[in-house]
Amino acid sequence: MALLEICCYSMECALTAQQNGADRVELCAAPKEGGLTPSLGVLKSVRQRVTIPVHPIIRPRGGDFCYSDGEFAAILEDVRTVRELGFPGLVTGVLDVDGNVDMPRMEKIMAAAGPLAVTFHRAFDMCANPLNTLNNLTELGIARVLTSGQKSDALQGLSKIMELIAHRDAPIIMAGAGVRAENLHHFLDAGVLEVHSSAGAWQASPMRYRNQGLSMSSDAHADEYSRYVVDGAAVAEMKGIIERHQAK
């Protein structure tokens, strides 16, 4: 049966995902940045209360995946922290200036991760040559690759995802970006073994007082009084679709 991973941005969201049938959580901060490394406090609280596998993302900033020496040092330190806290896996990825896997740096990450299952995230979708990259990731011992098939959403990239799945002895190919209940059957019919979804929505803040003339973001039009949360009903619906597909 296909595995359902839910992207979560808080302990509360991780618990919601767990309660509604998620098989695994990718734990992140900063949804508007596409997911950054969670704080130590969030990591510890999730480790204590969530019982399904949780894989934190290790990504020090938004934007591309070519990092300075200081950023890479932080990545290694965060990898060690996640390992010390007892998480079963993590999510990360580093490219060089030419859009190839930065093999020396990824080798250091794999050494720091030790026995943890490492997912190479959507840095894959920004690489120059996906098949060469997949070969490099196989050589590194990467457990899985999260990809939209190098398109803006995974449904558009499904043909590339199927091509990657057919690659012999490669890591697990996990489809992500825009995967929802309404299109999930396309991925299941294509033989995708793992799917990744945020299964969420923006929720209004409970604050009654609101200073509408102030933004805490560099985006002056950002809504400071909303937060991204996992929709438990959406998770349960996706899990049900997977189970019914398996029963066919």
Swiss-Prot record:
GO cellular component, one term: cytoplasm
Alphabetically ordered keywords of this record: Cytoplasm
Taxonomic superkingdom: Bacteria
InterPro entries named among the record's database cross-references: CutC-like (IPR005627), CutC-like_dom_sf (IPR036822)
Coiled-coil residue windows: none
Pfam name, any one: CutC
Gene3D superfamilies recorded: Copper homeostasis (CutC) domain
Record keyword Cytoplasm present: yes
GO molecular function: copper ion binding
Compartmental location: Cytoplasm
Complexes and interactors: Homodimer.
Protein family per UniProt: Belongs to the CutC family.
Cross-referenced NCBIfam families: PRK11572.1 (NF008603)
Protein name: PF03932 family protein CutC
Organism the protein comes from: Escherichia coli O127:H6 (strain E2348/69 / EPEC)
Lineage: Bacteria, Pseudomonadati, Pseudomonadota, Gammaproteobacteria, Enterobacterales
